[in-house]
Swiss-Prot record:
The keyword Oxidoreductase applies. InterPro entries: Cu_Am_ox_TPQ-bd, Cu_amine_oxidase, Cu_amine_oxidase_C, Cu_amine_oxidase_C_sf, Cu_amine_oxidase_N-reg, Cu_amine_oxidase_N2, Cu_amine_oxidase_N3. GO terms for molecular function: copper ion binding; primary methylamine oxidase activity; quinone binding. It comes from Lens culinaris (Lentil). Glycans are attached at N149, N252, N382, N576. This is Primary amine oxidase. Cu cation binds at H460, H462, H621.
Length: 667
């Protein structure tokens, strides 16, 4: 699951998450280079590396109290919020939770974690682990037995999960691949070998060579453009993107202003991109109105569906085990983002706490081409009425690459008040080698599809869970489910025999808000029951969910115990500053005792409270030959749409953009 990435040097318009002095940032700003260095110094002063084995596994902003942040938004010069950093470090094989106050440059607390699970893996220890087999005599013997060249082998580390063991060490599986004749290593696995490495001991603690399956051929697996030969695919014509009036958005530090929207962009080494303090200007009320306090992907659960020794452990939690922020890669201008995009750089950290510059981590751009609204009126005699408005969206994009998969993550904003988080998957299938070359040779369950000779693409899922802390016109919100009900007409009062109507229920507790989306239609809305429109409706925002995908593992299966937050498509909890990670704070080798599913057993009240919605977006992936050797985008999305939030269509008075013609060109 671990793969290397190079930080590309690219020319573009940039903003950088870096501020000096330390105390001038917004309370939710990402950690800067200077802050990473300060944290490194403070911790190393207490635990000198000369006589301590110290590794930083998470360095993140300790969320300030929400009420202080909201006061800061209105009176930044009157509110002073201490800048606190939360650190998870492994020191002499013990996991420490260290809280640092950078305002006074000292450690506030230092506690040892004695529970289940381990922190996010570091890149440094994975580098060391994947090098172990190449120097391990039994593995070298297995390679020679297969007639392979050890110099053409690369390895990758994979988290192992938990399968009922009483005790766990910080171990990973190490799988190896052939890089001979192709850089597409994941489609050329060396199967039949089990390698387990202990990350604390940094040695191989278990090794088995079970059987020999063919290594899939390198033929037709190369994806680099420089290695392609004719005939080429469909020709793409160049497109010039030009905004003669300049971009419609402004980036001021970490604050983005666009059209009627204003929001804050944050970045965390575990969550990746974080959207905060999203508010929209109401033209009729002449003020900005709060919508979303914070939104991000809390976890990604990827269980593979092969129970054999080769694959059973592959049930990954990409955010909690590898870190979405740590796995964010540099975006490629004119490829990942359009020519008119602007880029934002940021910093992540290494295992020794050193800041690492990440160029082009985020891009911001406007998208054109859709229709905002339109109507052609033909019902008025002797009049021809045609009105149409162009839709212009604002997109915020990052790409997270965890091993073989690339996750293209967007947040889209529309002037109509919509927000649209979307996910697009590309990259390489997880391939299992086989001696089978044709479908007719399959005589038993292979747990996937034969996508090429000697290559099985394993069935698997992708379950993303979004953390959505709504603040609809304030923090006191409720969650409503409006069901659509069929009514049969029995009194003969109409020529119709049936119609449908609605029935609304307000969720009183967390149990009421556990929603499985299926055939029964329902509207799911977060409302502010204290604020109503002129006609008496509660103001709110509606979730238009992604196409539902439900877990198919049994609830007593160990991976599903750890990933129980996928048991429902929607959850609602009261806001709790410490409940950030749906799979728990410590996910590697976790046992499912600190998850969203466990928290909600308290069945807390959620009526007219500060509440958080959690939405699970899932994809069941049955591989096909078109996914090989590299996948075209597989995408899904959901929408957050104002529902009785405005008095009327908020973009009714939007004027069409001025037509622009290039000099020397004609229509």
């Amino acid at each position: 699951k671990f793969a290397l990435f190079s930080v590309l040097t690219l020319l573009s318009f940039h903003a950088v998450f870096s501020f000096t002095p330390l105390h001038t940032q917004h309370p939710l700003d990402p950690i800067t280079k200077e802050e990473f260095l300060a944290v490194q110094t403070i911790v190393q002063n207490k635990y000198p590396i000369s006589n301590n084995k110290l590794a930083f596994h998470y360095i993140g902003v300790d969320d300030p109290e929400k009420d202080l942040v909201l006061k800061y938004e209105t009176s930044p010069t009157l509110i002073s919020i201490p800048r606190k950093i939360f650190v998870v470090a492994i020191i002499n094989s013990q996991t420490h939770e260290i809280l640092i106050d950078l305002t006074i440059k000292s450690i506030v607390s230092d506690n040892i974690h004695n529970g289940y699970g381990f922190p996010v893996l570091s890149a440094a220890e994975q580098f060391l682990a994947i090098d172990l087999p190449l120097k391990y005599p039994p593995f070298i013997a297995s390679v020679n037995k297969r007639g392979l060249n050890i110099s053409e082998i690369v390895c990758s580390s994979f988290t192992m999960g938990w399968f009922g063991e009483e005790k766990n060490s910080r171990t990973v599986r190490v799988d190896c691949f052939m890089k001979e004749s192709t850089v597409n290593i994941y489609v050329r696995p060396i199967t039949g070998i089990t390698i387990v490495a202990d990350l604390d001991l940094m040695k191989i603690v278990e090794y088995h060579d079970r059987d020999t399956e063919a290594v899939p051929t390198a033929e037709n697996t190369e994806y680099q453009v420089s290695k392609q030969s004719p005939p080429f695919g469909p020709k793409q014509h160049s497109l010039t993107s030009h905004q003669p009036q300049g971009p419609g958005f402004q980036i001021n530090g970490t604050s983005v202003s666009w059209a009627n929207w204003k929001f804050h962009i944050g970045f965390d080494v575990r969550a990746g991109i974080v959207i905060s303090l999203a508010s929209i200007y109401d033209l009729e009320k002449h003020k900005s109105r709060r919508v979303l306090y914070k939104g991000y992907i809390s976890e990604l659960f990827v269980p593979y569906q092969d129970p054999t020794e080769e694959f059973y452990f592959k049930t990954f939690f990409d955010s909690g085990e590898f870190g979405f922020g740590l796995s964010t890669v540099s975006l490629i201008p004119n490829r990942d983002c359009p020519p008119h995009a602007q880029f934002i750089d940021t910093y992540i950290h290494s295992a020794d706490g050193t800041p690492i510059f990440l160029e082009n981590a985020i891009c911001v751009f406007e998208q054109y081409g859709n229709i905002m609204w339109r109507h052609t009126e033909t019902g008025i005699p002797n009049e021809s009425i045609e009105e149409s408005r162009t839709e212009v969206d604002l997109a915020i994009r990052t790409v997270v690459t965890v091993g073989n998969y690339d996750n293209v993550l967007d947040w889209e904003f529309k002037t109509s008040g919509w927000m649209k988080p979307s996910i697009a998957l590309s990259g390489i299938l997880e391939i299992k080698g086989t001696n089978i070359k044709h479908k007719d040779e399959i005589k038993e369950e292979i747990h996937g599809k034969l996508v090429s000779a000697n290559s099985i693409g394993i069935y698997h899922d992708h379950f993303y869970i979004y953390y959505l802390d709504f603040d609809i016109d304030g923090t006191q919100n409720s969650f409503e489910k409006t069901s659509l009900k069929t009514v049969r007409i029995v009194d003969g009062g109409s020529k119709r025999k049936s119609y449908w109507t609605t029935e609304t229920q307000t969720a009183k507790t967390e149990s009421d808000a556990k929603i499985t989306i299926g055939l029964a239609p329902a509207e799911l809305v977060v409302v502010n029951p204290n604020i109503k429109t002129a006609v008496g409706n509660e103001v709110g925002y509606r979730l238009i969910p992604a196409i539902p995908a439900h877990p198919l593992l049994t609830e007593d299966d160990y991976p599903q115990i750890r990933g129980a937050f996928t048991n429902y498509n929607v959850w609602v909890t009261p806001y709790n500053r410490t409940e950030k990670w749906a799979g728990g704070l410590y996910v590697d080798h976790s046992r499912g005792d600190d998850t969203l599913a466990v928290w909600t057993k308290k069945n807390r009240e959620i009526v007219n409270k500060d509440i958080v919605m959690w939405h699970v977006v899932g994809i069941h992936h049955v591989p096909a030959q078109e996914d090989f050797p590299i996948m075209p985008l597989l995408s899904t999305s959901f929408e957050l749409r104002p529902t009785n939030f405005f008095e009327r269509n908020p973009v009714l008075k939007t004027l069409p953009p001025r037509d622009f013609t290039w000099p020397g060109c004609s229509n």
